Structures are given as structure tokens and as C-alpha cells.
């Protein structure tokens, strides 16, 4: 069953979808389209490539800032599509869904579909409960204005991203604690195999831009 949580001042009991939605609406929400899923992947990378092309043809501060904003948005889009892949929603074929989610969405933005799926499904099972792995993201709020300002500034200046990259690489390599996740060993934040996939996919991006004589574009697309 798919369960829906309606959040009010108090956590209400779980409801089955057919208690709030019609059968037609449930079928519509559950429907998957291979064409739409793959088209969304193509769209994300097409927009990234187009942004780089526009800046290359008209290099100035305005096209640079526009490209940075658009590419950042599509990187977020890839992460969102990885979320869909973690739920098996990109394509009907499970193996194809996992490969596309991992190599086209997750690895280029330094993430991992399998590791994300492992904890994210726990989030759905325990939304806003003590066992919710995402509880730390919402529990501190509301926060004081000074605290909120610090959070915003950390994001604007990339501090949050650098911390995530540090944890991703060094905790993965150095931590020894392991656990099983879909048949894989997970060390630290992600498995070492995942780390290699991230590095490999970003090397592809790096050498693609390098072949066009623009090595530094990887900073915008890869990071």
C-alpha cells in the first residue's frame, strides 16, 4: 500500500490513498512513462549544454551568471530525478531505471541512488517520527533570524557544498563501519564503488570540456 501523511499541528493517522483520492487519480499518480522519464533526463542535460554554449558564444558577466544559475537549477533537477529513480519511477524496467538514475543523475552530481534509496525509504516509513532519518532537517525549525542568515550565507558561498564533498570523499575512504544496502557494502557516506563511479563520471565531463578547449567548465557542471 501507498500511505499518505497529512501534516497538521499533530501527526494524524496514516491514510490509504483511496480514502482521499479516487481510483482514477491513484492510477494516474502511479502511472509510469519510459518516454517521459528519459525525456526529462535529456532535457536536463540539454539545458546544461545549451547554457554552456550560450556563454561560449557570448562570454560576458551576464551570460556567465545566467549560465551558473541555470546549470545549478538543472543540477538540482538531476538530484530530483535521482529521487524519482530511487522510487523506481524513471522507467518501467528496474535495471534500466537504476542505471539511468545512477549514471545520468546521481554520479554527475556526486550522489548515489542506492545509498539514497536506503535511507529515503526509511524516511517515508517514519515521516516526522523519531526514526525518520530526515528529522534533523526539520526538527530545529523554526530558528532565530541569525541562525537562518548563517544557513543562507553558507549556501550562497558554497560552504555547505564543500562540507558535503569533504564528507563524501574522506568519510567514504577512511571510515570502516559497514552495512548492507541492496547487496552492497556501504562505508561511511557511500560505498567506495560509488566513489569510483562519481570520479569516473566527472572525469568524462572534465575531458569532454577539455576536448573543446574549456577544461574549467567542469567546475560549473561537475561541482
Located regions from the model:
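Post-HEXXH active-site segment of zinc metalloproteases
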Residues: 92-106
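Non-catalytic, topology-defining segments of multipass membrane proteins
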Residues: 2-72, 106, 110-220
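Residues in and immediately flanking transmembrane alpha helices
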Residues: 57, 87, 96-97, 137
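Acidic (Asp/Glu-rich) catalytic motifs at the cytosolic membrane interface
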Residues: 75-94, 115-128
